[in-house]
Amino acid sequence: MRGVRPTLVTRVAVRVIAAVILVSAGFLMVRYASLPWLLPVHFQANGFPNGWQYRTPARVLLPVFVQLALALTLGGIGMLLLSRMHGADEPEAPDVKAAAAAAEAVTLMALIWVAFQAYAAWALVSMWTTERAGFGLSYSYLELSGAVLTGAVAVRAHFRLGHPAPRPFVAEHWRYGQLYKNASDPALFVPTRDGRRWTLNFGRPVAAALLGLILAVGIVGPTIILAILLRGR
């Protein structure tokens, strides 16, 4: 038995993500000494600063922390998606292929936003150095481009996942009519009752872990980043 093998695109994307994070961290550490000891963090309507914070490694490396949070969180989701154990005779099973496609999509989304944070690192250094508000029009264009690319990845994944064939209905495997729960089924992804899309098998603990991790992204992640920003005010 083995887990789902990641696609070539997934493996390449993971390497690129690691390289982007290392380059971002190196750039910020090289520029650290040249930054003002008081970093402008709040600006007036005319673009001049009226609020500062002390320069610290944690503040300067904030884009890298965001990159790491994205990489570790989305990477964790990808690993959970690939955790479906299967035999050597099942590599083409529909749910195995669906897991590989979903993990690829998650990894590509991580790459998009990790790369965006690399530009954010450069924009922050520029803002701190010039002491003028704003990240420039390029920031907005790249942010919009990231959103468009994320949507394109999601659409691509949707077509790759396809429409699974519905399974024979077994009443004890379905809770509240739509929630699939079958601990004896090794699949993480299973067809919905009508076969129109995929759903999770909540009989597997990894499904609960997957939902918990996704919730943590939206709750814990922003809290930690906000704490770093407000530290020392």
Model-assigned labels for residue ranges:
Residues 29-44, 118-128, 226-230:
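Membrane-helix interface motif
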Residues 219-233:
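Juxtamembrane boundary at the C-terminal end of a transmembrane helix
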Residues 32, 70-90, 152-167:
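Membrane-water interface of transmembrane alpha-helices
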Residues 4-21, 62:
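Alpha-helical transmembrane segments and their helix-start/interface "positive-inside/aromatic belt" motifs
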Residues 157-205:
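Membrane-proximal soluble regions of multi-pass membrane proteins
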Residues 28-60, 188-190, 196-200:
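Active-site and channel-lining beta-strand-loop segments
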Residues 17-20, 52-75, 136-151:
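Alpha-helical transmembrane segments
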Residues 11-18, 73-77, 102-115, 205-213:
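Select subsegments of transmembrane alpha-helices in polytopic membrane proteins
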